[in-house]
């Protein structure tokens, strides 16, 4: 996300804290941010606080911060940790929002889902949207939908599909470079044509896979081998994992 903000020439002063001093030095050099090794000073300087730690580390971090006596807008990027837990651990005058920015934010092509309480002011809502819109598209949704979004939106699905398709391409005779090029075109460029156009995914599938043709035969073979079921099982496993974060 820092790389995406840098790419967008964001005007905000960004102060970064991390207990790993080596990481702080690297971020200062690479992303042109102000670093603050002292957690309490970093929090004291912030009028918008972004908590970007692993879900299992959220409670430890909030305990380390202790009580904050002034109003601060706080955004949690921790997957699966609900607003209720955040507010209970680190409540008023902190105003909590949850956001899930994708790794593609580094290139300005991100997608961020935001979930906020009904009590959040329009001004705070705009501040959050404005921040994440600098690194890609922003959508708002009820918190109850955020776990499912977290499982589905990950760029890992694209990388996983690319690796699998390119691997299969190499097995039938293509060299690695050509296999990756052809597979990336099939996935990325095909999806861009859908996203930037006005055609439904169903109509594009019908167009690309004529009955009895090569594409239709390939897709049918994948389905027979359990492609759709494998995707569903993977998504279900991911959903169980993200929901387990609330219990860590």
Describe these PLM feature segments.
Residues 2-8:
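Gly/Ala-rich phosphate-binding loop of Rossmann-like dinucleotide-binding domains
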Residues 8-28:
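NAD(P)-binding Rossmann-fold cofactor-contacting core
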Residues 14, 24, 42, 58, ...:
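Small-residue helix-packing motif on alpha-helices
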Residues 30, 85-95, 111-148, 157-198, ...:
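Internal alpha-helical scaffold of NAD(P)-dependent oxidoreductase catalytic cores
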Residues 34-39, 139-141:
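Short acidic-hydrophobic, aromatic-tinged amphipathic segments that line or gate anion-handling sites
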Residues 184-248:
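NAD(P)-dependent Rossmann-like dehydrogenase/reductase catalytic/cofactor-binding core
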């Amino acid at each position: 996300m820092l790389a995406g903000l840098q790419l967008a020439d964001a005007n905000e002063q960004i102060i970064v804290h991390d207990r790993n001093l080596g990481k702080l030095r690297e971020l200062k050099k690479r992303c042109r941010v102000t670093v603050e090794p002292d957690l309490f000073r970093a929090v004291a300087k912030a009028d918008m606080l972004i908590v970007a730690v692993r879900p299992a580390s959220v409670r430890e971090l909030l305990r380390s911060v202790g009580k904050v006596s002034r109003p601060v807008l706080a955004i949690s990027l921790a997957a699966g940790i609900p607003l209720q837990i955040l507010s209970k651990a680190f409540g008023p005058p902190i105003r909590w929002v949850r956001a899930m920015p994708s790794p593609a934010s580094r290139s300005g092509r991100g997608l961020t889902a935001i979930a906020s309480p009904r009590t959040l002011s329009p001004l705070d809502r705009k501040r959050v949207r404005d921040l994440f819109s600098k690194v890609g598209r922003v959508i708002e949704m009820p918190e109850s939908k955020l776990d499912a979004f977290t499982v589905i939106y990950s760029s890992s699905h694209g990388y996983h599909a690319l690796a699998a398709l390119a691997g299969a391409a190499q097995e039938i005779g293509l060299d690695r470079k050509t296999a990756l090029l052809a597979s990336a075109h099939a996935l990325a460029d095909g999806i861009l044509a859908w996203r930037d156009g006005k055609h439904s995914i169903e109509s594009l599938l019908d167009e690309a896979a004529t009955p009895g043709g090569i594409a239709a035969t390939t897709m049918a073979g994948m389905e027979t081998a359990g492609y759709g079921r494998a995707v569903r099982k993977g998504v279900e496993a991911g959903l169980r994992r993200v929901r387990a974060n609330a219990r860590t």
